[in-house]
């Protein structure tokens, strides 16, 4: 099946450069089998989409407004099928606090948290110290790629960390620091097929470092160990958690769940990404390849699935 595929990229998100890098890979691979066109998320998007007349849209967008339900709602108004989760699923996953609230309700292992939205960073700092002590992680509520995230494993300047996170939005999420391996599990969820969880991937980093923006996207800064070096029962638990998180938020097509695993094999779920990175250093495509699915076949399956999906299908929470 040869399709006209509009690949959306860019926009004014803090992750715009990553979006374009992901889109380049998607465009190159889809172009082997389909007629593709790169369309920028800007003021000319409606004109350019209308002129191209796509069968399906692949919104390769990271962070708001491309991954939070805004673009998804726009595409639904245009009546265009698209790859990825719908408006509701995208919005729920992007809001870390709301997502974690839903995760708790279905028994998924998540850390305690504190939502900070007051203007006074010093007042917020005092409340955080009283609740969690000095060892915390501070992150923007609705942002990806670890942008604005500060880890304070030995304590530190909480007020400054709050202000750094607030450069990506007024509301900040604070969690107690949890020491563990960073691992991830991708889900592929196609219409009429059983959900597939790709092999759990462990992220190996230079000593003392974590999977921040630099280590995510600079070639050679991290190693993806597939499968992760964990006991089989822990790998099975993580795969089950990833599936349950995907279903809990009512997601579809694809997602990637991020976890920490302690030295005693305690697992905590951090967040779920509805449009995982597709760059040369990204985790989701690597895990798909480890499962025997080439990048070209992966993106082809996603667009064919999207255009074949029955319209106006509801994906209930916890489905």
How would you name each of these model-derived features?
Residues 1-88, 92-98, 105, 117-127, ...:
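ATP-binding N-terminal substructure of ATP-dependent carboxylate-amine bond-forming enzymes
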Residues 153-233, 237-240, 266-268:
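Phosphate-binding site of ATP-dependent enzymes
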Residues 3, 104-105, 231-319:
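ATP-dependent carboxylate activation and anion-phosphoryl transfer catalytic cores
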Residues 1-9, 49, 92-181, 191:
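Active-site nucleotide/adenylate-binding loops and adjacent lid/helix of ATP-dependent enzymes
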Residues 38-42, 176, 183-184, 250-264:
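A short glycine-rich, hydrophobically flanked beta-strand micro-motif that places a catalytic Asp/Glu
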Residues 116, 149-154, 187-190, 261-262, ...:
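Short beta-strand-to-turn element immediately C-terminal to the catalytic PLP-Schiff-base lysine
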Residues 36, 81-82, 110, 136, ...:
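Hydrophobic beta-strand scaffold residues
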């Amino acid at each position: 099946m040869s399709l006209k595929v509009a690949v959306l990229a860019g926009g004014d998100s803090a992750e715009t450069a990553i979006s374009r890098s992901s889109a380049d890979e998607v465009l190159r691979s889809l172009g082997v089998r389909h007629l593709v066109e790169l369309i920028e998320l800007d003021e000319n998007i409606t004109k350019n989409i209308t002129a191209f007349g796509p069968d399906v849209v692949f919104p390769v967008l990271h962070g708001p407004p491309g991954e939070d339900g805004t673009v998804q709602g726009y595409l639904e108004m245009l009546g265009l099928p698209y790859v990825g989760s719908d408006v509701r699923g995208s919005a729920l996953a992007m809001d870390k606090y709301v997502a974690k609230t839903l995760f708790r309700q279905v028994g998924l292992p998540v850390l305690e948290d504190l939502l900070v939205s007051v203007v006074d960073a010093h007042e917020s700092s005092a409340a955080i110290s009283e609740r969690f002590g000095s060892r915390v992680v501070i992150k923007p509520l609705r942002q990806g790629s670890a942008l604005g995230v500060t880890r304070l494993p030995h304590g530190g300047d909480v007020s400054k960390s709050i202000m750094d996170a607030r450069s990506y939005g007024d509301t900040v999420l604070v969690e107690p620091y949890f020491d563990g391996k960073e691992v991830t599990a991708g889900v592929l969820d196609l219409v009429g097929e059983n959900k597939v969880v790709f092999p759990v991937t462990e992220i190996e980093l230079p000593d003392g470092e974590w999977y921040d923006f630099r280590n995510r996207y600079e070639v050679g800064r991290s190693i993806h160990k597939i499968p992760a070096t964990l006991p089989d029962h822990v790998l099975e638990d993580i795969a089950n958690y990833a599936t349950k998180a995907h279903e809990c938020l009512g997601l579809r097509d694809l997602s990637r769940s991020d976890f920490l695993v302690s030295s005693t094999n305690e697992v905590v779920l951090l967040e779920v990404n509805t449009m995982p990175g597709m760059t040369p250093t990204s985790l989701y495509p690597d895990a798909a390849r480890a499962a025997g699915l080439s990048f070209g076949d992966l993106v082809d399956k996603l667009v064919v699935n999207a255009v074949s999906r029955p319209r106006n299908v509801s994906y209930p929470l916890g489905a």
